[in-house]
Amino acid sequence: MKDKTFDVSIIGGGIVGLATAYKLQSKYPNLKIAVFEKEDSLAFHQTGRNSGVIHSGLYYKPGSFRANNCVDGRKQLVKFAIDNNIEHEICGKIVLAKDNDEAKKLKQLKLNGEKNGLIGLKILNKKQLNKIEPFAGGVAALHVPESGIINYKQTTEVFAKKILEINEQSKIFCSCKVLDFDEFSLSTNKGIFISKNKIFCSGLFSDRLAKKDNLKTDMKIIGFRGDYFKLTKE
């Protein structure tokens, strides 16, 4: 039973689950951590099927935990990507104003971003906008140079590799679905695991697991599906 006993169990093998596991393992190298993922591979759901945006912290209320967390997280993520040769690009983004009423709001948005520590924010007129994005149809825009994109699936896989390098007793279990749990154990399709500490990073299924823990809440996660199209270059 020793190989099925862990100090901490993390349910969910997406970017949140693996980032949480990596941070814990880095801070406490002797901690024996298990990550449980029901699919055949990590980052199978939202993590591997999104736009890969590195958010800058432009919109959040200055001084709020969310703003500070976003800005600090962006810096840590970019450094981690550089150190580990993860596909990423700090390409910047533009926030488009489609008419004059929206253009007036760009100043406040710029100020908000500057209060959050963003560098290089610039309001663009239509001519400047079209130099960056010739096909944009707005009247003005805010250029946010510190935004970027990253391969989150690759990032998740690197987190997993690092965890096992730090402590070979830690484990990543794929195709291992958590069916039930109590204070001291987890019941899965691969047997029972012993673990007093559990962290749920289960994405769209987090509300269902909360109910299994008898957590009384009126909140319900409603998922929305998006479609991506790959265009042929002309």
Question: What are the roles of these predicted feature ranges?
Answer:
Residues 142-197, 201-208:
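Helical element adjacent to the flavin cofactor pocket in flavoenzyme catalytic cores
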Residues 21, 25, 162-164:
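Gly/Ala-rich phosphate-binding loop of Rossmann-like dinucleotide-binding domains
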Residues 11, 56, 200-201:
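Redox-cofactor binding/interface segments in oxidoreductases and associated redox assembly factors
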Residues 2-16, 34:
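Beta1/beta-strand and adjacent pyrophosphate-binding region of the FAD-binding site
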Residues 25-49:
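Glycine-rich FAD pyrophosphate-binding loop
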